[in-house]
Structures are given as C-alpha cells and as structure tokens.
Amino acid sequence: MLDREGYRPNVGIILVNARNEVFWGKRIREHSWQFPQGGIKHGESPEQAMYRELYEEVGLRPEHVKILGRTRGWLRYDVPKHWIRREWRNTYRGQKQIWYLLRLVGRDTDVCLRASTHPEFDAWRWSEYWVPLEAVIEFKRQVYQQALTELSRLLFRSKPAELPEGYRQGTASQA
C-alpha cells in the first residue's frame, strides 16, 4: 500500500528502559543495527501497527510497555534506487513513518526475538538514547535524527537535553 507520492505508511518504535537507554536490534544475518519498524496494513491504525510490529519483532505485548508519545506527523525517507525491486522502481520512493516512544514496564527477559516465524533481529542491546548517527544506515539518518530529537522532550523535560554533534538542526547526512 503506497500513498500518491510513492511512500509506504510505516511505524517506527523507540523503546526505552528505566535508564532512558534505547532498544537497538541487530538485523538478522547483517551487521547493521536499527529500531523496530514495519508497515501499516490496510485498515490498521498506526497504533495497532505499532503493537503488531512490537510483538513480531521484539516479542513484547501491550502490557509490557507504556506509550509516552508519538511524532506529530509523518517522517519520510527515500530508499536509494538500487535497493528497490525493479518492478517497483517507477512507483515506490520510500517510507513515511509515525514514530512511537515507548517505555518498557516489563522486564528485559520479556524480549523475545523469535516471537514470529520471520524474525527481523538476531541480537539486541540497550544503547544510549542519542545513538551515533553514523551507526544508522545513511538514508535513514535524517528520520532517526528527527524522531529522536522530537521525542526527546518527553524524556528529558526537567533539563533540556544538549543535542550531541550530528543531532543539531540540519547536520545529519542525507542520501
């Protein structure tokens, strides 16, 4: 399901623990790390998609998390042409995402990367909130920067978080 501009509706999930560290999943059989994310199915709300993806990719159920907030609007990224299947190249541009910030209220042992028959991750870890942007695949960096920056105000209310290098407005690399 694509919108008129060629973007696939999608949700992204920033899951934090009590120390405000983020869940970082290692893509199966790859050396890249990312946040959980996935497409919104026809007839599904972004929140329903978020809970489905959270279970499929991380094995967590709604009772394991608390929603702290979400991005105000869609954040978009274009996928490089050489990553797009040939039959989709004339219509598909990339993803548009609503990002959710979730607090784990369950335990680390509730995480199960094999909850679905098609696992996305083969390892995971907790990382500092401001993940190094160079660790993010280049074409997703700006969206990660935008989502982490926008949602940080929900975690760091008492003192404005000093944005690390690379998170200051307009400094993320773009594809």
Curated annotation (Swiss-Prot):
UniProt cross-references to PROSITE patterns, sorted A to Z: NUDIX (PS51462), NUDIX_BOX (PS00893)
Segments carrying motif Nudix box: 38-59
Record key words, sorted: Hydrolase
Name of the protein this chain belongs to: RNA pyrophosphohydrolase
SUPFAM superfamilies in the record: Nudix
Enzymatic class: hydrolase
Source taxon at top rank: Bacteria
Residues covered by the Nudix hydrolase domain: 6-149
GO biological process, one term: mRNA catabolic process
Role: Accelerates the degradation of transcripts by removing pyrophosphate from the 5'-end of triphosphorylated RNA, leading to a more labile monophosphorylated state that can stimulate subsequent ribonuclease cleavage.
Keyword Ribonucleoprotein: no
Annotated CDD domains: NUDIX_Ap4A_hydrolase_plant_like
GO annotations of cellular component type: cytoplasm
Record has Hydrolase as a keyword: yes
Cofactor requirement: a divalent metal cation
PANTHER family, per the entry: M7GPPPN-MRNA HYDROLASE
